[in-house]
A protein has these predicted regions:
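Functional transmembrane-helix hotspots
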Residues: 96-135
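Individual transmembrane alpha-helix segments
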Residues: 141-170
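Transmembrane alpha-helical insertion/packing segments
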Residues: 1-70
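Short helix-capping/hinge motifs at transmembrane helix termini and TM-loop junctions
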Residues: 33-37, 98, 102-106, 183-187
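Alpha-helical transmembrane segments with an aromatic anchor "belt"
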Residues: 67-88
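Juxtamembrane interface at the cytosolic side of transmembrane helices
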Residues: 175-190
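Alpha-helical transmembrane segments of multipass membrane proteins
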Residues: 21, 25-29, 53, 90-98, ...
């Protein structure tokens, strides 16, 4: 029987390796989102990558279960721990890449592209509806900004990276529960 520390060490090692693969996949999604403002085809890949991420997470977790099954059966707790750690390491990679990209390379182009989207006629029409306008006015009053453009320009690279990390940590916990349920080692029936 394996010791808990050995099982944890093995689970953590696999989570780091496979979380790295998942993190690079998420970075590909970030690249498609950012480059999609210049090449619209790449923007259309973003939903595919987002929807494919849980599937990739499932297949990576299934790979983990297949690799360690002989050492010790993977119960729900170990499967959840692996999945959570895998998503955690992927989030760290994506957060770091996001911060580096927006600090060193973006130079505000993503914010400017979003501001340009606000100037499109269909967006102006949508934003001028009474319900949306009241929400915008409430947000501007609460935050002290004079316009949406000013609010967008106030977003720092650290804020973008922190939001991505927060969101992905939450999603990681949520996705870890069903993934762990499906990948745990099934008992052999005699």
């Amino acid at each position: 029987m394996a010791l808990f520390s050995d099982v944890f060490r093995q689970t953590n090692a696999y989570a780091m390796q496979l979380g790295g693969i998942l993190g690079l996949y998420w970075c590909l999604g970030l690249l498609c989102m950012v480059a999609g403002f210049q090449v619209s085809f790449l923007h259309s890949l973003v939903p595919v990558i987002i929807l494919g991420a849980p599937l990739l997470g499932y297949f990576l977790a299934r790979y983990f279960e297949g690799q360690v099954r002989a050492d010790a059966p993977v119960d729900f707790v170990r499967a959840f721990l692996f999945c959570y750690l895998m998503y955690l390491y992927a989030t760290v990679i994506l957060g770091g890449v996001t911060y580096i990209y927006f600090t060193m390379f973006d130079e505000g182009s993503l914010i400017e592209a979003n501001i340009a989207q606000l100037q499109r006629p269909e967006m102006k029409e949508l934003l001028s509806s009474p319900q949306i306008q009241s929400q915008i006015n409430e947000a501007l009053t609460t935050t002290g900004f004079k316009s949406l453009e000013e609010m967008f320009r106030s977003v720092t690279p650290l804020m973008l990276a922190a939001n991505i990390v927060d969101l992905n940590l939450l999603i990681g916990v949520i996705l870890s529960i069903p993934t762990a349920f499906f990948i745990k080692t099934k008992p052999i029936r005699k």
